[in-house]
A protein has these predicted regions:
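Helix-turn-helix
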Residues: 17, 21-59, 63
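Short helix-capping/turn signature of helix-turn-helix
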Residues: 54, 96, 110-117
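Short, basic, alpha-helical segments at the C-terminal edge of helix-turn-helix-like DNA-binding modules
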Residues: 66-71
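Amphipathic alpha-helical packing segments from all-alpha helical-bundle domains
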Residues: 73, 77-78, 100-109, 119-146, ...
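Hydrophobic/aromatic-rich alpha-helical bundle segments in the mid-to-C-terminal region
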Residues: 120-126, 146-205
Length: 205
């Protein structure tokens, strides 16, 4: 287990350091193994200091899940340029490292098993899903408008749901068996499928 160097910093930064230590511990040991003691060891602090920032392990886990979802996927703000290249780059970023890697898979597997039984995690999951889907829907709308195609919100929403499903499925394949695919192969497959869905080219890939 690699320990973090916990340094003097503003309250918000120290809290973020502890959240990252929580995620590292969950990725390695799972939710059950990520005790307050193990997280404190990872962070290089005392369990008492952990309790200064978080009232309980449940609160730590909830904040860690919220942070994971915020950084788990690329967001629309991470890409710039014209609508077509923006949408294409958004898709590629969400199917390549660091979004698609072993750590992401470990965290996803640990948290997703609890989403169905923990109402707070379920609410955080819904919030993260909708933020990602809304980003995707906006990128699709901008692309369709730029191409002179109808961009009805209901249709853009349907496209976003479908494309999110394509990304999720290929992301999982890449994380579980990345060695079976050539570099950028899954991103290329996703782009081809999405072009077929939209009936438009997203450019070279």
């Amino acid at each position: 287990m690699n320990r973090r160097t916990f340094h003097r910093a503003p309250e918000g930064e120290r809290r973020q350091d502890l959240i990252e230590a929580t995620l590292d511990t969950i990725a390695e040991l799972g939710l059950q193994g990520a005790t307050v003691r193990q997280i404190a060891i990872r962070a290089g602090v005392t369990a008492g200091l952990m309790r200064h920032y978080f009232a309980s392990k449940d609160q730590m886990v909830a904040e860690a899940y919220r942070a994971m979802l915020a950084n788990f996927a690329a967001r629309a703000g991470d890409v710039a340029g014209e609508p077509g290249p923006r949408l294409r780059q958004f898709i590629v970023l969400n199917l390549t490292a660091p979004v698609a890697n072993d750590r992401s898979l470990s965290l996803w597997a640990s948290f997703i098993s609890q989403v169905r039984v923990d109402s707070e995690l379920a609410a955080i999951h819904r919030e993260g899903y909708l933020a990602f889907r809304n980003d995707l829907q906006a990128l699709i709308r901008d692309f369709l408008v730029a191409e002179g195609r109808p961009a009805d919100e209901a249709e853009c929403r349907r496209h976003a749901i479908a494309i999110n499903g394509i990304i999720d499925g290929l992301w999982l394949e890449g994380c579980l068996a990345g060695e079976l695919f050539e570099e950028a192969e899954l991103a290329s497959i996703a782009l081809s499928a999405i072009e077929a869905l939209l009936g438009l080219s997203l450019g070279s890939h």
